[in-house]
Amino acid sequence: MIDYYQGQPKRIQHFLKVHAYAKLIGEQEGLDKEILDILEVAALTHDIGIKISEEKYNSSAGKYQEVEGPAVAQQMLEDLQYDKAKTDRVCYLIGHHHTYDQIDGIDYQILVEADFLVNLAEEHSSKETIESVKNKIFKTKTGIWLINKIF
């Protein structure tokens, strides 16, 4: 992913921060090795659709990332000979990481929480926005602890 976003420090730093939070939350929540692996790969690749979205739509909006990201990630993960079932789940997570009313697993929940922890800080969100996101989105004990401590 660093090669993929070479020369774009904002993009690289974003996915590395999301990965760090996702790994921390996943470990603290006791995820098993397989789910933690999926979560970590999804965290590193969750915004892989931004590049093609900006080229095709002149936008990095979440809806475009969800449309364009899975195919790019699938090709990358296949090239790396990553497990097929895990690739399918990672691509699902990439294709839904801006959809908050369909969270269907702990990997999805943690990915969303980790992405919000980073986005809320990067966007200098208001206290009201942070509180609203915390109340509507955050479910894990570790994620709630982090959002309370960070903000």
What are the functions of these language-model segments?
Residues 6-16, 20-32, 45, 82, ...:
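Divalent metal-dependent phosphate-bond-processing catalytic cores, especially two-metal-ion Mg2+/Mn2+ enzymes
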Residues 14, 37-40, 86-90, 110:
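Short, conserved alpha-helical segments within structured domains
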Residues 76-80, 84, 88-96:
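Mid-chain, well-packed structural core segment of small domains
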Residues 36-58, 69, 91-98, 115:
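His-Asp-centered metal-binding catalytic motifs of divalent-metal-dependent phosphohydrolases/nucleases
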Residues 1-17, 49-59:
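Active-site flanking loop/helix segments enriched in acidic
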Residues 18-21, 63-79:
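An active-site-proximal "capping" alpha-helix that borders the catalytic cofactor pocket
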